[in-house]
A protein has these predicted regions:
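Extracellular/periplasmic carbohydrate-active domains that bind, remodel
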Residues: 1-206
């Protein structure tokens, strides 16, 4: 589990004013990475960051409409059981942010870039009602950003439009001669992203 080592490195870089944390070839296992301002993550081509069970718990909250809380006590801080709160028109996705593989709140100037791979590794929940799961199985987001600015996630731009081949289930570029080019080694590869691959609320400049 590399979570604490990575989070400590991000914290130290942030305190120094920022920097680039480089992930060289290898596999890095994480629960929840805490993003901080002015710290960029760079993944080399043979680097993989993969999710582990046991990420951060959803933050505590409370809704006045008793029927939509998971508990019966008015002091129960747990999330409501139903995935939608119809009386307040609040989607659960914009209520809980911390149960994610990467989490940032009120941060600025953060990049997660390179040509490596980020995968939930089957450990990010893809269904509603995460509080019905065991505590270590409640992360349902890969990237969760709340009230952030100037965020970049991706590979390297090569000034070509990307297309999708439904037969091969793969992306491709179109070369100058009109041929399909399936070389996407310039991309950051992201898979198994959970219920919300990217949840950005009150966030500008992505």
């Amino acid at each position: 589990d590399d979570t604490e080592t990575i989070n400590q490195a991000i914290k130290e870089m942030n305190e120094l004013g920022g920097g680039i944390l480089r992930f060289t070839a290898g596999t890095y296992n994480v629960r929840t990475v805490h993003l901080l301002s002015n710290v960029w993550l760079h993944l080399d081509a043979d680097a993989t960051i993969q999710g582990l069970p046991g990420g951060d718990a959803p933050e505590t909250t409370w809704f006045s409409d008793r029927a939509y809380r998971s508990g019966l006590s008015p002091t129960d801080p747990r999330p409501y059981a139903d995935p939608e709160n119809y009386l307040t028109k609040q989607d659960v996705g914009h209520t809980f942010f911390r149960n994610a593989m990467f989490f940032g709140e009120r941060i600025d100037n953060v990049k997660i870039v390179g040509t490596g791979r980020i995968t939930g590794n089957g450990n990010l929940v893809t269904s509603d009602k995460v509080m019905n799961n065991a505590p270590e199985k409640r992360c349902d987001k890969m990237f969760s950003l709340k009230l952030c600015t100037n965020i970049e996630i991706g590979g390297w731009n090569i000034d070509k439009d990307m297309w999708y081949d439904p037969q091969k289930d793969e992306p491709y570029y179109i070369d100058a001669d009109g041929q399909k080019n399936y070389d996407v080694s310039n991309m950051l590869h992201i898979d198994q992203g959970g219920h919300f691959v990217l949840l950005a609320t009150g966030t500008d400049g992505i």
